[in-house]
Amino acid sequence: MRIGILGGTFDPIHYGHIRPAMEVKASLKLDKILLMPNHIPPHKNTTHSTTEQRLEMVAQVCTSLPGFELCDIEAKRDSPSYTVVTLKQLSRLYPDDELFFIMGMDSFIQLQSWHKWQQLFEFANLVVCQRPGWHLAAESRMQHELSARHASIDALSISSHPQHGHIFTVDISPQNISSTQIRSQLAMGEIPRDTLLPVTLNYIQKQRLYFS
């Protein structure tokens, strides 16, 4: 089984998270996507909703979307959400499956600042989402890593057993949506129907989340 993993604060989860994940799932023919809210993001100091509320929003999204599942192992951890620790744990939970950790190009460029980043490749493949026609600058620190580990999507159909350590790039449609933007709209009394799944908007309104 090929399993995609998309982590994030998801405060709240929105189409800017979901649509790229769906495109990656289709492009790489993944069997499912794990949506994984983190508990204590290493690069963020606070959230605007509780861990329980974010878990519930993601759980409801997964109920609405076939092939999506909630993964709560980071949310239940009382320590920073270091990706290498999470992937090691997931590789033990799914020993016979192939893991694909999904990230944006902006995160990939900063990958060398991540905790034990080189060990990520011991447990999973990386999927780097990029806008069509966009390429990593030749002088980028991560260009060598990308060149050395880059694999074509066609190679997936050739492999008969799980692999890790590769980097796949997937062109995705631009998504000019952010959680900050959505929270600001809600605080001003605007209803961002075009950016949230109906089930998420309904939950936010019932819980009075993000309203000032």
From Swiss-Prot:
Tell me its EC number(s), please: 2.7.7.18
The protein here is known as Probable nicotinate-nucleotide adenylyltransferase
Pfam families per record:
CTP_transf_like
Which keywords fit this entry according to its UniProt record? ATP-binding, NAD, Nucleotide-binding, Nucleotidyltransferase, Pyridine nucleotide biosynthesis, Transferase
Q: Which GO terms describe its molecular function?
A: ATP binding; nicotinate-nucleotide adenylyltransferase activity
Q: In which pathway does it act?
A: Cofactor biosynthesis; NAD(+) biosynthesis; deamido-NAD(+) from nicotinate D-ribonucleotide: step 1/1
Matching Gene3D superfamilies, A to Z?
A: HUPs
Q: Which PANTHER family match?
A: NICOTINATE-NUCLEOTIDE ADENYLYLTRANSFERASE-RELATED, PHOSPHOPANTETHEINE ADENYLYLTRANSFERASE
Gene Ontology terms describing biological process = NAD biosynthetic process
Can you name the source organism?
A: Shewanella oneidensis (strain ATCC 700550 / JCM 31522 / CIP 106686 / LMG 19005 / NCIMB 14063 / MR-1)
Give the source's domain of life in one word.
Answer: Bacteria
Similarity remark: Belongs to the NadD family.
What function does this protein fulfil?
Catalyzes the reversible adenylation of nicotinate mononucleotide (NaMN) to nicotinic acid adenine dinucleotide (NaAD).
Reactions catalysed: nicotinate beta-D-ribonucleotide + ATP + H(+) = deamido-NAD(+) + diphosphate
Q: Which NCBIfam families match?
A: cyt_tran_rel, nicotinate (nicotinamide) nucleotide adenylyltransferase, PRK00071.1-1, PRK00071.1-3
